[in-house]
UniProtKB/Swiss-Prot annotation:
GO terms for molecular function: rRNA (pseudouridine-N3-)-methyltransferase activity. It comes from Thermotoga neapolitana (strain ATCC 49049 / DSM 4359 / NBRC 107923 / NS-E). HAMAP family: 23SrRNA_methyltr_H. It comes from the Bacteria. S-adenosyl-L-methionine binds at residues 100, 119-124. This is Ribosomal RNA large subunit methyltransferase H. The keyword Methyltransferase applies. It is found in: Cytoplasm.
Length: 151
């Protein structure tokens, strides 16, 4: 299984350290890839969101499930997320998680996504969101395999 996370913006160095930490742990479960997009500048907020959304969509793995991370999405427990991941893994599919930049994502991409999940009702930076998604993917695989980590 391949998991790609496409994020609208560059990651800070302290986030990259955490990303490397979880990518190392995830090696035995799946292949992970993080794609950082350059921030879009110029124009109205709506124009920026539209351009960033188009760039995110271009990076979706062919044939993968497109999962958008957005505060308007469905809130899942770690166990429910593990169930989702297990189902996708059993179907032999890959997943591309899309995380928008500071202005978020367009309504269009929310309607095109296979699933829309929320990490929390709180707002996180795009970098923190990447780190949280990676940790939850790792936690999900540990739950699926019945290994100690999640209590």
């Amino acid at each position: 299984m391949r998991i790609r996370i496409v994020v609208g913006g560059k990651l800070d160095n302290f986030i990259k350290m955490g990303v490397d930490h979880y990518k190392k742990f995830l090696r035995r479960f799946c292949k992970t890839e993080i794609i950082e997009l350059k921030r879009t500048h110029g124009g109205s907020v709506e124009e920026i969101v539209k351009r960033e959304t188009e760039e995110l969509k271009k990076r979706v793995l062919p044939g993968s499930l497109m999962v958008v991370m957005d505060r308007r999405g469905e809130n899942l427990s770690s166990e429910e997320f593990a169930g989702f991941l297990k189902e996708v893994e059993m179907k032999g599919k890959d997943i591309t998680f899309l995380i928008g930049g500071p202005y978020g994502l367009s309504e269009e991409i929310l309607s095109e996504a296979h699933r829309v999940f929320s990490l929390s009702r709180m707002t996180f930076t795009h970098g923190m969101s990447v780190l949280i998604v990676l940790e939850q993917v790792f936690r999900a695989f540990k739950i699926i395999r019945g290994e100690n980590y999640h209590y």
